Amino acid sequence: MCDSKDNSGVSEKCGKKFTNYPLNTTPTSLNYNLPEISKKFYNLKNKYSRNGYGLSKTEFPSSIENCPSNEYSIMYDNKDPRFLIRFLLDDGRYIIADRDDGEVFDEAPTYLDNNNHPIISRHYTGEERQKFEQVGSGDYITGEQFFQFYTQNKTRVLSNCRALDSRTILLSTAKIFPIYPPASETQLTAFVNSSFYAAAIPQLPQTSLLENIPEPTSLDDSGVLPKDAVRAVKGSALLPCIIVHDPNLNNSDKMKFNTYYLLEYKEYWHQLWSQIIPAHQTVKIQERTGISEVVQNSMIEDLNMYIGADFGMYFYLRSSGFKEQITRGLNRPLSQTPTQLGERVEEMEYYNSNDLDVRYVKHALAREFTLKRVNGEIVKNWVAVDYRMAGIQSYPNAPITNPLTLTKHTIIRCENSYDGHIFKTPLIFKNGEVIVKTNEELIPKINQ
């Protein structure tokens, strides 16, 4: 842990400077510009009284109006300071999470008095009452930066008053009073960052180029299996641990040791089949692409998102507040349909019009998503094979003069109505050429 004199000064124990993220800034990608308050767990103190019930252990407050006297000792005696990280949402608001238990601040719907709500500790769900706007400015005398937290309706701010129990009611809401010069009520609603712990954040990988479809080198060369295929990193995103289900870690351990998870998006050429087709012969081959329902459900459970029928990303409530940052980092679009991508099974008839036997290997583009912990351990990965981008390589590729011809195409099964596209036949596969097809059906657009 490091201590700091103020928000922009030198860390006394660490001997290095750190800069606070400017307040009221436009949303930015988690990948490249994490604000300081999203990279550290800060202990918060009140600006004027310097007490921080449950948020810091400091001197007894000398005078606090509108707080019952029996709450003074509770605030003073608490020796369990809280260290809080603020996860930046797409809209510029924050989720305030506790390093100790992995829970987040939640504005409970019940009332205390004067239309004020208790702020409780709760598991993250993505609801509006867990989102807070941080606003503030600097003290022109001391240069110290302080701030308030606005609640969802922007008519209340977080207050240190009414903190009755360190694990039930953390804070409460209060009316908005001028932050400077301070009203007496502002003593408990204006906060400053104090000492901190660094968050556990993984390194982002460099992107790379996708290689050409691999070629067979002999009739006996069946090609590269999917598990051995060369991957190209096309994007990556940092996922706040509050949206990730890690079967091996509880919320507290996730927050401390994997504050952010790494989600990598890779592409590779997925072998669909490899076969020697005799001269002037037709063969039937079954091809399986897309993604299974079991794999989609796994992605929903662990990431609260899935791959749409248009191969874009679809987000549920828990992850939707971060969807712009995630898709920007992954270099993937938002899905324009609520329909999930399903598994597609087709029967193809191919004709070899050459005068010699030929080894043909067909590949389709695979889109792979891998979830990793800070230490690089893989939690899980999900693969969707895109039937719309495919190509065939052959051996020998000379002296053959005639390409492989798709003479008949039948869909055996497709798990959603948007996978019903049939290739027009005959379709010529030139050696090494990638055929790109898109659905002819109009997929209805939605607003995520």
Swiss-Prot record:
<feature type="region of interest" description="Probable pore-forming domain">
    <location>
        <begin position="226"/>
        <end position="407"/>
    </location>
</feature>
<keyword id="KW-0843">Virulence</keyword>
<comment type="function">
    <text>Component of a binary toxin active against Culex and some Aedes mosquito larvae. This subunit is responsible for localized binding to specific regions of the host larval gut. The individual subunits are not toxic. BinAB and this subunit alone bind to the gastric caecum and posterior midgut of C.quinquefasciatus larvae. Binary toxin internalization into host gut cells requires both proteins. Does not bind to the midgut of Aedes aegypti. Toxic to Aedes atropalpus mosquito larvae; mortality towards both C.quinquefasciatus and A.atropalpus is maximal by 48 hours.</text>
</comment>
<feature type="region of interest" description="Beta-trefoil domain">
    <location>
        <begin position="19"/>
        <end position="200"/>
    </location>
</feature>
<keyword id="KW-1015">Disulfide bond</keyword>
<keyword id="KW-0800">Toxin</keyword>
<comment type="subunit">
    <text>Forms a heterodimer with BinA.</text>
</comment>
<dbReference type="GO" id="GO:0030435">
    <property type="term" value="P:sporulation resulting in formation of a cellular spore"/>
</dbReference>
<dbReference type="GO" id="GO:0090729">
    <property type="term" value="F:toxin activity"/>
</dbReference>
<comment type="similarity">
    <text>Belongs to the toxin_10 family.</text>
</comment>
<keyword id="KW-0749">Sporulation</keyword>
<protein>
    <recommendedName>
        <fullName>Binary larvicide subunit BinB</fullName>
    </recommendedName>
</protein>
<feature type="disulfide bond">
    <location>
        <begin position="67"/>
        <end position="161"/>
    </location>
</feature>
